[in-house]
């Protein structure tokens, strides 16, 4: 049978070694087989990957030469030859990405293109054949361009090689292994100060706060549709979700979240619960304030996870704390308050105890408490040459016709009680003081005319005497 086939020549529609494809009956020359189209598509994708990475195209054939007839029917399609990546390539890519992120941190140009191309990982031969048509390819690129309008290019790598994707997917199954490139957090200098506490497991987002989408296991799961790549986009939150997506995810996750948020409180033995703390857990000193008599619920925004975890201690410190009730006195004690006259007497009594009127004359000093009976700001007149019959009432009656008259007193001997022949009269108004000095001088009070002089009682006070002595020493008189 083989000789018959050899004698008959090449089969129609199959390529001959070193020659062109022989078209079969009813088959046009411009038509291509599925294998050739698959090879061209893989070569085009490999070239696109190399262009994105910026490396020269090496070792990738554009097309595979024709295969003999018998072998083409039995051998499966040859795989695409990919370049061998060295062991240090991962670190070099990381350093390159960090350098680009640091350079773009100062100036962030708007990203015009669509999301980065992930590659044909996870596609079967049947899926690849469907993407060959121009309609499917145009629809796929239009869909990518419409999904993500603009994203900051500094927050994730532009392209991830397939070998690194397979290596990361194999290592992510072990605990503590590195996360995929697209799921890694951005550079530390772009996010802000690091959170205190040990680092947590990869992506500590609770199920209710995570946006609906494919699982976060490996890059192979991020196949089209590419609506929401799991990369951080908002530096203000430091998470992979925006405010709108996070709120929708929280509302759709649990219907009883509103009831649970009212019961969440920080008390003597509690800490902020629920999705309030996202990422590494806060220290106990920040997450748990001082115990209060009555705990207050946290704001609803913190419970929903709409605020970053670093602002939770600030909110806890700004909460209004209940003041202890003031002890109210019994009703009977309200009438026992100290009245104002008692307060005035108390104020006057204090200076009286501290104030001492020390007099000095002829080299001797003594205390005269009788001066405390007079007003310190009055205008005082000395009345001399008084008769023995003149007392305080007679002297006051003589000067009482002046409106601002205050007090009149005759000085007597303490031991015998006899008058010393002089006294004092005080006025509040200086005009009355001047009138009394002019009108009453030489008038009869009792059986004798009185003599009026300006009172010099202040000149014998100890403080005044010392002040005058200092002034005389300065002038050089003594």
Swiss-Prot record:
Is Transferase a UniProt keyword of this protein?
Answer: no
The protein's matches in InterPro entries, at most eight in alphabetical order, are given as: Nucleotide-bd_a/b_plait_sf, RBD_domain_sf, RBM42_RBP45_47-like, RBM42_RRM, RRM_dom
- What positions does the domain RRM occupy? 379-457
Which Pfam families does the entry mention? RRM_1
Q: Which residues carry this modification: Phosphoserine?
A: 133
Q: Does the keyword Ion transport apply?
A: no
Q: Give the quaternary structure.
A: Interacts with HNRNPK.
Report the family membership: Belongs to the RRM RBM42 family.
Q: What is this protein called?
A: RNA-binding protein 42
Where does this protein come from, organism-wise?
Rattus norvegicus (Rat)
């Amino acid at each position: 049978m083989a000789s018959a086939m050899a004698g008959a020549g090449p089969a129609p529609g199959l390529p001959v070694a070193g020659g062109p494809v022989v078209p079969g009956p009813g088959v046009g020359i411009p038509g291509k087989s599925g294998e050739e189209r698959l090879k061209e598509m893989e070569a085009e994708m490999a070239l696109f990957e190399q262009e994105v990475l910026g490396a020269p195209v090496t070792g990738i054939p554009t097309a595979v030469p024709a295969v003999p007839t018998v072998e083409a029917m039995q051998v499966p399609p040859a795989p695409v030859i990919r370049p061998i990546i060295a062991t240090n390539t991962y670190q070099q890519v990381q350093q390159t990405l960090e350098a680009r992120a640091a350079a773009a941190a100062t100036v962030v140009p708007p990203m015009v293109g669509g999301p980065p191309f992930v590659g044909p990982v996870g596609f079967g031969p049947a899926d690849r054949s469907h993407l060959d048509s121009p309609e499917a390819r145009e629809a796929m690129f239009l869909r990518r361009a419409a999904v993500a309008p603009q994203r900051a290019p500094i927050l994730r790598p532009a392209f991830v090689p397939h070998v690194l994707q397979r290596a990361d997917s194999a290592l992510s199954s072990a605990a503590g292994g590195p996360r995929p490139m697209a799921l890694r957090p951005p550079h530390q200098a772009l996010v802000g100060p690091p959170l205190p506490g040990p680092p947590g497991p990869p992506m500590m987002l609770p199920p209710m706060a995570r946006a609906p989408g494919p699982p976060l296991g490996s890059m192979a799961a991020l196949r089209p549709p590419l609506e929401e790549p799991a990369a951080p986009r908002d530096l203000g939150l430091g998470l992979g979700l925006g405010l709108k997506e996070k709120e929708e995810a929280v509302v759709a996750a649990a219907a009883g979240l509103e009831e649970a948020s009212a019961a969440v409180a920080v008390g003597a033995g509690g800490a902020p619960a629920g999705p309030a703390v996202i990422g590494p857990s806060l220290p106990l000193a920040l997450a748990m304030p001082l115990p209060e008599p009555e705990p207050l619920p946290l704001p609803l925004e913190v419970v929903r996870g709409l605020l970053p975890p670093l602002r939770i201690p600030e909110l806890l410190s700004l909460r209004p704390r209940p003041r202890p009730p003031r002890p109210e006195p019994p009703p009977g004690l309200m009438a026992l308050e100290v009245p104002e006259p008692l307060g005035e007497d108390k104020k006057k009594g204090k200076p009286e105890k501290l104030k001492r009127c020390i007099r000095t004359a002829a080299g001797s000093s003594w205390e005269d408490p009788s001066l405390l009976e007079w007003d310190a700001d009055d205008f005082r007149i000395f009345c001399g040459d008084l008769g023995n019959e003149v007392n305080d009432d007679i002297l006051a009656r003589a000067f009482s016709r002046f409106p601002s008259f205050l007090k009149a007193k005759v000085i007597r001997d303490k031991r015998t009680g006899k008058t010393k022949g002089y006294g004092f009269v005080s006025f509040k108004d200086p005009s009355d003081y001047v009138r009394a000095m002019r009108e009453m001088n030489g008038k009869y009070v009792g059986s004798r005319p009185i003599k009026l002089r300006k009172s010099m009682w202040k000149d014998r006070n100890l403080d005044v005497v010392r002040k005058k002595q200092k002034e005389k020493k300065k002038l050089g008189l003594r």
